[in-house]
């Protein structure tokens, strides 16, 4: 029998482990039905967020339905090498001319929405595919995205705990980039909230 995304997430919570499930188990041979995909909001569309976005877009079990960042669209983000983020985005969009006349490092929620929609449009061969919402405030996102399964927290470090706790209290599973928090008391609150809400959580350590 097929396993829906919610059955899978519920089982992960009950067992307390993270399991990698083959595609054919989730949705039949080589295909995952849209209703069985894990719907994800990507919170934080800066340098590190875009560095890790491509892997999520390419995952057939995941559908990014929303992005969030207080910044709309700019090209003044810090990066480790010249044009590194722009070139990464070009690679996973299959578009070598993406923003060719724009200098600097791109970031912001509208850039995130543009990239997510462009990736899925290319995947579906639909020129105008639009399915990703963009929010300036993560609290508004959590209120409006009723069918959301999980969030990935890619904000600056000082917001990790705040966003994660708010998401867990809404019953959303949380994937968080390190660190859990900047302060010990906040880290403890994150762990306590995870135990109380019994949602699935995972911390991405350095290099993972």
What name fits each language-model region?
Residues 173-175, 180-208:
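A contiguous active-site-proximal alpha/beta segment in oxidoreductase catalytic domains
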Residues 1-170, 188-200:
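N-terminal glycine-/serine-/threonine-rich beta1-alpha1-beta2 phosphate-ribose binding loop
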